[in-house]
Amino acid sequence: MKTPITEAIAAADNQGRFLSNTELQAVNGRYQRAAASLEAARSLTSNAERLINGAAQAVYSKFPYTSQMPGPQYASSAVGKAKCARDIGYYLRMVTYCLVVGGTGPMDEYLIAGLEEINRTFDLSPSWYVEALNYIKANHGLSGQAANEANTYIDYAINALS
């Protein structure tokens, strides 16, 4: 899994050298941001249920047909609503994993790689998840560096969906 730290180490090792001062500074910067990233991951995790439920409601409000149309890809039944919440939760989990490792590796490997195919196969609209992620970003309650760190990965997911 790629992270800024593993990439710096891999580059140095491939060239048979020690880490350069620039690479060491990048690693140090990651460690300085790590506390804020872990704070964000903890907060998102402890508030996950509230954020997921609120994000699902935001999707139903912006796209009312999602809770009115019958079908496996819609939230017109309890099963459909549970699937919607599960999917939103998956995006939120990926954000927390990225926060913990300090890079987009988890999202790249476990989510983005097959995202377009999954959405097409199951007739899911990326705009639903963009709305959910925008809700989470606007309502996560984080501030300062913790918010910056979380928003970086939320924006990364939004851009992947756009």
From Swiss-Prot:
Primary residence: plastid
Posttranslational mods: Contains one covalently linked phycocyanobilin chromophore.
Membrane topology: Peripheral membrane protein
InterPro entries given in the database record: Globin-like_sf, Phycobilisome_asu/bsu, Phycobilisome_asu/bsu_sf, Phycocyanin_a
CDD domains tied to this protein: PC-PEC_alpha
Similarity-based family: Belongs to the phycobiliprotein family.
Name of the protein this chain belongs to: C-phycocyanin alpha chain
